[in-house]
């Protein structure tokens, strides 16, 4: 285990993204960076200033490959920003915290947590859910107003940590159907779709 210094703002960000009591900072950062729980720790030491810092991580398998972009370092004390893009295929199950799900009082809270996990697993593809609609109204949109315009008493709620909104004034069966359609749209197998439905 290595120690690093971080500023107060980063510390607060990590602390607010804790999903359960006892979760380590490493686990939180792995989740936020989409590195998964099995990623190897890599240490880079720079003793002298250089123009470019390059980090290479050799993946154990193609599925766990990680792309690293380099950043220029202009002064020895300046901070280099390294953007890490995970290429592994994350699933909603990597982001579901069953303890937090169980603590929700009602179906709406569980529904929003499951949708938030789907968004975190597939942030780039999640927009496909805005095509899911009922006979007379939209179920998902990228603004509260769009959902309000599509019908009365929709009770739009923002999906946590995402730019998307969903209607919540529907029964549990309808919510399960919405989760089913969203999961199918995001490419889940029939068995995984059923597991996602049952989380509600």
UniProtKB/Swiss-Prot annotation:
Its main location: cytoplasm. InterPro entries: Arc_rbn_hlx_hlx, Ribbon_hlx_hlx, SeqA, SeqA_DNA-bd_C, SeqA_DNA-bd_C_sf, SeqA_N. It holds the Pfam family SeqA_N. The keyword rRNA-binding does not apply. GO terms for cellular component: cytoplasm. Keywords: Cytoplasm, DNA replication inhibitor, DNA-binding. It is found in: Cytoplasm. GO terms for molecular function: DNA binding. Residues 107-108 are annotated as: Interaction with DNA. GO terms for biological process: negative regulation of DNA-templated DNA replication initiation; regulation of DNA-templated transcription. HAMAP family: SeqA (MF_00908). Belongs to the SeqA family. Homodimer. Polymerizes to form helical filaments. This is Negative modulator of initiation of replication. It comes from Colwellia psychrerythraea (strain 34H / ATCC BAA-681).
């Amino acid at each position: 285990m290595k120690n690093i210094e971080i500023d107060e703002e980063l510390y607060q960000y990590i602390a607010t993204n804790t999903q359960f009591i006892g979760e380590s900072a490493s686990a939180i950062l792995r989740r936020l960076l989409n590195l998964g729980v099995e990623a190897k720790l890599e240490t880079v030491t720079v003793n002298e200033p250089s123009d470019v810092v390059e980090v290479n991580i050799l993946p154990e398998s193609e599925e766990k490959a990680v792309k690293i972009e380099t950043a220029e370092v202009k002064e020895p004390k300046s901070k280099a920003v390294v953007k890490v893009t995970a290429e592994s295929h994350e699933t909603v199950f990597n982001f579901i915290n069953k303890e937090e799900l169980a603590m929700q009082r009602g179906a709406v809270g569980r529904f929003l947590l499951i949708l938030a996990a789907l968004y975190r697993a597939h942030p780039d593809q999640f927009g496909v859910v805005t095509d899911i609609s009922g006979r007379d109204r939209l179920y998902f949109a990228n603004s509260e107003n769009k959902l309000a315009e599509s019908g009365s008493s929709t009770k739009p709620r923002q999906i946590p940590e995402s730019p998307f909104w969903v209607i919540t004034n529907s029964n549990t069966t309808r919510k399960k159907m919405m989760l089913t359609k969203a999961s199918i749209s995001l490419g889940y197998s029939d068995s995984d779709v059923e597991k996602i439905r049952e989380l509600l």
